[in-house]
């Protein structure tokens, strides 16, 4: 065995061994196509929130087409071995939602035990001068077009009952009119960092999903104080990237009403 940088490699007859299950000491792992020894969670693309898992008990290549309890949580893996970051087709609501303000991510769980993560949502919370209050609240469906400050309108408003002064909602990035073609691009690009007057902003698709599936659900909002550099590990399902703009860039690219 030889360590180069942060990775271990196995040499046989002065040649780096690749694509093989190996055991280094008491730890099972896998030597990838470059010979790097990996075990447990392995990031394939941090930007796209793609990770795989190598079973340290067997060292066999990535788990595929299965589910597995790992560190007290149940994860699902697709045919290519990637962690499934949305299993809402398997688990219905009501849900338990948790907003980590430090990392700009909302994780949806089946219940308050937080043992089964269901979905990850990229969010913007309040700026330091207009913070989103910590606490545990109940969600109630509000309006398809939610009137907000300005005036402005966000899509698919869900009220966070009891948070702030009674006007804190989960909603899409707001525009100055009730039109899907009135997106302020600069505000959309802030998703994932504090940007609001206290509301919880998401992309349109996620706001719609919460609106349709989380009425009556519990939400816990907190500051973890632990900023995580890797997108893939901002919560148990990581944090998805922003969808890129299409066309004129004046609409949310996740909006199902825009062809």
Locations of the language-model features?
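Extracellular adhesion/carbohydrate-binding repeat motifs centered on closely spaced tryptophans
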Residues: 1-94, 150
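Short beta-strand segments
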Residues: 9, 29, 52, 75, ...
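A mature extracytoplasmic/lumenal domain signature
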Residues: 15, 35, 58, 67, ...
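A short, compositionally biased
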Residues: 25, 48, 99-105, 153-154, ...
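Short, surface-exposed linear segments at secondary-structure transitions and domain or protein termini
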Residues: 27-28, 71-74, 125-136, 179-182
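Short, solvent-exposed loop/turn segments that connect beta-strands within catalytic domains
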Residues: 46-49, 112-116, 164-166
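Cell wall/extracellular polymer interaction/catalysis modules
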Residues: 81-145, 155-156, 252, 257-259
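Exported/periplasmic cell-wall-interacting domains
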Residues: 131-134, 143-259
